[in-house]
Amino acid sequence: GAEYILAKDRKDWIYKCLKLNEKKDIEVEETLLGTDLVGIPYEPPFDFFKKHERPGKTWTVLSADYVTADSGTGLVHQSPGFGEDDYQTCVKNGIISKDGTDMNLPVDEAGRFTDEVPPYKGMHVKEADKDIKDDLKK
């Protein structure tokens, strides 16, 4: 079956979102601290940016002091082109350079996805939210 890594404090919310029954569908294999996950590689949910991969850097778990367990899964995706905290975390961890010239920006000036993200090309980022969520559930 599927394996998930999630914040213990968020398990009830996540189980509800995934329509899972804790007693019937869930087996907790291991309990870890967030710091235990730092440096572990993961498979990105979409492969749009594989050509930008930097082995040992991209798609590895990072640590950031602004990530909390009071909402979502307790894990945060980094988008350095769309937020100062993400940008600083990615620079600090060598994902992108400080000048940002190697940063991937798949959105145009109007806030629409470019051809780098084929299924959502031309869609405004907010219009694409539902489709992205649906695709993530698959």
Where are these regions (language model features)?
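Non-cofactor substrate-recognition interfaces
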Residues: 1-138
